[in-house]
Amino acid sequence: MGKIHELSNLLANQIAAGEVIERPASVVKELVENAIDAGATQIDIVVENAGETFIRVVDNGAGIDPVDVPLAFTRHATSKITDRHDLFNIVSLGFRGEALPSIAAIADVELRTKTTETTTGLNYHIKGGKEISATPANGRRGTVITVRDLFYNTPARLKYLKKHQTELSKIVDIINRLALSYTGIAFTVSADGRSLLRTTGNGNQQQVIAGIYGRDNAQKMLAIAGENDDFNITGFISLPELTRGSREYLTVLVNGRYIKNFAVSNAVIRGYGSKLMVGRFPMGVININTNPLLIDVNVHPQKSEIRLSKETELAELLVTTIKNRLAEENLIPDAYETLYGQQNKQQNTQNTQNTFTPKAPWIAAEDSMDGHNAEKMSSQPIRRSPSLVTPVEITKREELSSDRVLTFTQKYTNELPQPVFETDNVVEQQVTEPTVTYQSQYSETGSHSQETLPLSEQKPTGFPALDYIGQMHGTFLFAQSEDSFFLIDQHAAQERVNYEFYREQIGQVTNDQQRLLVPITIDYSVSEMLAIADHQPELMALGLRLEPFGATTMIIREHPTWFEKGQEEETVREMTDWLLRDGQLTVAQFREKAAIMMSCKRAIRANMHLSDTAARQLLAHLSMAENPYNCPHGRPVLTQFTLTEMEKMFKRIQESHEKWESYDNHPF
């Protein structure tokens, strides 16, 4: 007897659901796309428990004829294509007829629908792929579909779902992309009784960007437009000063469909050229319209990847369009905004706090400000960040000589020093900071004074005693030992010194946090807010306290004392970018990345000319480092040429036919 047999429809649908429905966000995507294809202008999404127990999508679209409803839950039944020619001319978001039967196979589904052509609608109930009931129903035109108990008959799938906040952020992210694409549709999203997203449906894409990413970010967007014989491009791109740590903030829409395509996103980055910092990516929304014959959507179960004909031509059009648009714009950052914009935001926050109470207990801090704590705080002095009260004074620096006493001061509340190196720049910023004074190793009389270093007093085994010689091009230092010559990258060297200092500071979980009298606000999208809420323990472990301030804004209440003054917002943005990009970061990994980031930010740069004393101090600190050989990113700090190797380079040692001979034996 043969062993091959045809699978039942129920089992086949459950298998298909494994490809189409990965998580609650997949259900929301399929149902909302059906509503869009039905011509809806208003779509409301309601979820509970991140969609695991309840999802409801309500639209005012065309509805489904009652006769067609049972067929709609049959595999490969669709109204969107009829023959193979339609498969190459797809203009709808859905076309396979897999979504509804896949959802019904693994959940309890109830659908109520009505069209304008029928006097009554239909209320249809199906669970686990089996029809429960079909009864007449009255109501307005459109469709209401409710999904309960997702994966109830495939419990193994539930084990692979992430935390509720993570799953909810994925749902919101999908709706964000659809809202950016279909700006003429009014979307609302609510979860567990709280509103997460609301768009007006007025067709203004920049207004949707403001609703998702914040008004400040939307104001830093540039409109773009370009076309050739095959493609038409419109949309918005961010100014080079507005970047993120991943490509996730770049939305590419092809004929209204959100897609992921490396060649297209890479073309956007190429359009910026050298205007972007390494490892940073622009924000933006790119609308690409083309003949459906030039794209193949039927290559991915979730239809998130497509094949593009004439991809090279499209990429070049994107590069040219973006490059030309940036060339038209004055890209010099607004100095007033840079110096005073954040303080204005802080003042606005302070004024607003009197009338606004955050309504998001899902990100409540452990030591929330109740009435008792507020009263207690009001009677105690609060440390205020110097950056909020002390103006930056730019003064001309005196010419430094190597025989003067150089005193460097940098204050830290933990009273541990961090090395600071004088440069020969024309000006330097003098700001009042929290602590430590130490003298250079060369005093006025030339005597060797005692230094206090933030590193171990023991030199690493094998690290030579270096005698500083000079500097080249403000980037490299020359030094020598008894038998070798060394070339040192000054930026990498100070990165290593700073890294070991910050690693120690960040690794200490203490009460040395800076509580802000006037909190700093940062705009995030709703999906980012949800993801950040999921990682509050990691943030709190570093001494960073964030609280919600509305649907798309976070307040920095406290931050570690090692934050650089004036860079608090940028630092917090980078730290939250790590969490959003990497997802699963342990506290130890988080601290490691923070130490690396701060070490790079505080390191001297190329083309900065060090005084002899400062260079010697840098080498002294490097010699005390636990690992003086590599910067935190793995790049080499120094390279060595032995005396023998140098003699070979200059032919002072040559190989004869019989033996090595030295020019020292034959003086010129």
UniProtKB/Swiss-Prot annotation:
Alphabetical list of Pfam families matching this protein: DNA_mis_repair (PF01119), HATPase_c_3 (PF13589), MutL_C (PF08676)
Protein keywords: DNA damage, DNA repair
Polar residues: compositionally biased ranges: 438-459
GO molecular function: ATP binding; ATP hydrolysis activity; ATP-dependent DNA damage sensor activity; mismatched DNA binding
Region forming the signal peptide: none
HAMAP family: DNA_mis_repair
Protein name as catalogued: DNA mismatch repair protein MutL
Function (record text): This protein is involved in the repair of mismatches in DNA. It is required for dam-dependent methyl-directed DNA mismatch repair. May act as a 'molecular matchmaker', a protein that promotes the formation of a stable complex between two or more DNA-binding proteins in an ATP-dependent manner without itself being part of a final effector complex.
A GO biological-process term: mismatch repair
PROSITE patterns, sorted: DNA_MISMATCH_REPAIR_1
The family this protein is said to belong to: Belongs to the DNA mismatch repair MutL/HexB family.
Location of region: Disordered: 437-459
The species this protein was found in: Leuconostoc citreum (strain KM20)
Annotated GO CC locations: mismatch repair complex
